[in-house]
Amino acid sequence: SMQSGQLVIKPVSAQLTYDSEWFGSMDCYAKLTVGGSVFKTRPAHDQGKHPNWQETFTAMVNGDQVMHVAVYDHDNVTADDYIGECQVPLQDIYSRRNTSNWYTLMRKGKSSGQIMIILEFVPSGGMGNMGGMGMGMGMQTPGMNMGMGMQPQMGYGMQQPQMGMGYGMQQP
């Protein structure tokens, strides 16, 4: 199917309005569930309401329509505190290939903040999948031309201005 392949999931950061800590700072992490896989970011240590994760996970998906995301405050002593959750719709990702969005986290019917997630979809290979094929070929051709097609232009176009710089660089 056109909707089977790899879903690259990048929970980037969050802006939270709910604070679970009376003392000290929150160490929040995100838990993402899709296609039978569960991923957890590292707790953003002492980053409070502005956790910055910048992590990347890869899930195999097959037409999955929703990814569930929940944010918790990691607690060493008691159970982790629940901050909020959202459902990330995946319908768009199969055609658009990559999206970058803020999603509202809900807790007990109220917004508890927002989470930024970048998604990329890489379709499984196969003749039926022209999009995937096209991307593959498109990637290869510039690589091939790099040696032949690009070099003369770099040589002719750039050579004269860079000659002086080149020598200047080499001498010291």
Task: Describe each region flagged by the PLM.
Residues 1-2, 120-172:
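Intrinsically disordered, low-complexity repeat regions enriched in Pro/Gln/Gly/Tyr
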